[in-house]
Amino acid sequence: MSFDSLSPQELAALHARHQQDYAALQGMKLALDLTRGKPSAEQLDLSNQLLSLPGDDYRDPEGTDTRNYGGQHGLPGLRAIFAELLGIAVPNLIAGNNSSLELMHDIVAFSMLYGGVDSPRPWIQEQDGIKFLCPVPGYDRHFAITETMGIEMIPIPMLQDGPDVDLIEELVAVDPAIKGMWTVPVFGNPSGVTYSWETVRRLVQMRTAAPDFRLFWDNAYAVHTLTLDFPRQVDVLGLAAKAGNPNRPYVFASTSKITFAGGGVSFFGGSLGNIAWYLQYAGKKSIGPDKVNQLRHLRFFGDADGVRLHMLRHQQILAPKFALVAEVLDQRLSESKIASWTEPKGGYFISLDVLPGTARRTVALAKDVGIAVTEAGASFPYRKDPDDKNIRIAPSFPSVPDLRNAVDGLATCALLAATETLLNQGLASSAPNVR
């Protein structure tokens, strides 16, 4: 029954029942974690063959001695595999070390210090400051980069086919201080939304007041399907070039959630001008990436189909966990109508919206009973969710029994926070004080 249809007395009685359920959670002495989208040990085990590669044969197919310096672009064979997966030409893709987030950080830093290919000056010299558009809910570590660098962040609502492009077009057309936008175009974090072709076309084609506006295209979940189908990649570089804005997209990806989260390979894609620009400055801090690690990945995968087959093994582990979360949330929260949640077809997260004004309270209640959940508001710039309703759930790391207990407990906390808030708002002013 919807909470809206309850009398004050019924709401008070329901609140008392949720208090009893919460007290039972307190007695369980839980220690459960839903915070980060980390691969489980079972998933990491899928890649253990990497630990014995490349063995004594340290040369790649081109004859490069991977043990030595050099090779800033990365190994051609591995670049070819991920160029196919990402829909990018090989010359437009370079392979780096383990962290695509590091690439993003460096490119923002390089832009601040030196300016980009189309920049009239270094961003740090812009008198009116720098602004970034941030689709919300979004990736907290993206927002941490721009916040650390003193870049103003503007939230953009996320729709079913991507961010609100009407609003984006309106903003970028008149404000030259808007230099970039964070994007996760496939199976977004945490929304699960995949940008439509039309959304991508408009983003690369739109007129911007800043000549050096950039799309930070974080394709972190390009092959991370929860079904048996892989998403079709939109050729963002090709569309941008056709629109006359070849330098607009910076494309990022990595194997962090494909092989070893701390020992994978990152990728940066862009126009040939952007590739040369990046390497010009990256070459000052490193003489080349870890090519031995790239070689082991090349041999482990073999080709793009090898990556796809590997990801279907991940899918077999992850899909039941995501289905379990949806099942528990449906059982516990559907009738009350105080929450909604995504059921993504890929990626690593579920976005849960609870009763507005109760997300922080829900997370605090969960923490007090030993259920760790990502901080409420983390998916928004400056950690400020204006509606205080969004909670990110990461199902990948816990075991299935722990995941069930954690989500069930989180649902109890959401229900308790909702009845508590409704009573305190005076929507049931005649209800007894049961707090």
From Swiss-Prot:
Lineage: Bacteria, Bacillati, Actinomycetota, Actinomycetes, Mycobacteriales
Keyword Transferase in record: yes
Protein name, UniProt field: Aspartate aminotransferase
Substrates-to-products reaction catalysed: L-aspartate + 2-oxoglutarate = oxaloacetate + L-glutamate
EC number, as in UniProt: 2.6.1.1
Keywords: Aminotransferase, Pyridoxal phosphate, Transferase
Gene Ontology MF annotations: L-aspartate:2-oxoglutarate aminotransferase activity
Broadest EC class assigned to this enzyme: transferase
Source taxon at top rank: Bacteria
Binding site for pyridoxal 5'-phosphate: Y69, S100, L101, N189, Y221, S254, T255, S256
Gene3D superfamilies to which the protein is assigned, alphabetical: Aspartate Aminotransferase, domain 1 (3.90.1150.10), Type I PLP-dependent aspartate aminotransferase-like (Major domain) (3.40.640.10)
Function: Main aspartate aminotransferase that couples nitrogen assimilation to aspartate synthesis. Has a weak, but significant, side activity toward kynurenine (Kyn). Oxaloacetate and 2-oxoglutarate, but not pyruvate, serve as amino acceptors, while Asp, Glu and Kyn serve as the best amino donors. Essential for axenic growth and survival of M.tuberculosis in macrophages and in mice.
Species whose genome carries this gene: Mycobacterium tuberculosis (strain ATCC 25618 / H37Rv)
Record-listed substrate binding positions: Y139, D140, R141, R392
UniProt record similarity statement: Belongs to the class-I pyridoxal-phosphate-dependent aminotransferase family.
InterPro entries xrefs: AspAT_Ic (IPR024551), PyrdxlP-dep_Trfase (IPR015424), PyrdxlP-dep_Trfase_major (IPR015421), PyrdxlP-dep_Trfase_small (IPR015422)
